[in-house]
Amino acid sequence: MQSICLQLLKDPVFISLDVQSNVSEQPFGDEETLQGALNRAKQACKEEQVHMAFGLEGGVKELNGQLFICNWGVLQTEAGEQYLAGGAQLPLPREVALAVRSGEELGPVMERYTNQTGIRHNEGAVGVFTSNIVKRADMFEHIVKLLLGQYFKDHPNC
């Protein structure tokens, strides 16, 4: 996210905060995943005196009987403006979907599935299932671009 902001914003200053999403450990559905991103952005804006804050959240959703990864982002401004954007979606293999549907969080399921640790903080499930052509960071960077693009449309002189 910082690389995108450095490209698009004038002299940005970054404050990285670990704020709670206040949704399930494994958000299920677009609504809950988006709510997690909203909660993170609002909380980050509240905790620090910032011009804007980003909230990003990954989750899973059902579509036509298949379980997909989904991800959402929110840009919240100090003036209370909110910009929303969703990212790429990809179906999960049956065995991964079954474990997540039974109540397990995707991160630990992916660690078992791949026999690797730290999947959620590295390539993510999307990296595993796209042969690392698209990584978790790529998905969230795309969302940040969508958010900033909307913001710049409303604030062309920034």
Where does each model-flagged region fall?
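Intervening/peripheral non-core polypeptide segments
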Residues: 4, 17-19, 73
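A short beta-strand-loop structural module common to alpha/beta enzyme folds
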Residues: 10-24
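N-terminal beta1-alpha1 ligand-phosphate binding loop
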Residues: 1-9
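Glycine-rich beta-strand-to-loop/alpha-helix junction loops that act as flexible
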Residues: 2, 13, 17, 56-58
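Anionic-ligand binding patches
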Residues: 26-158
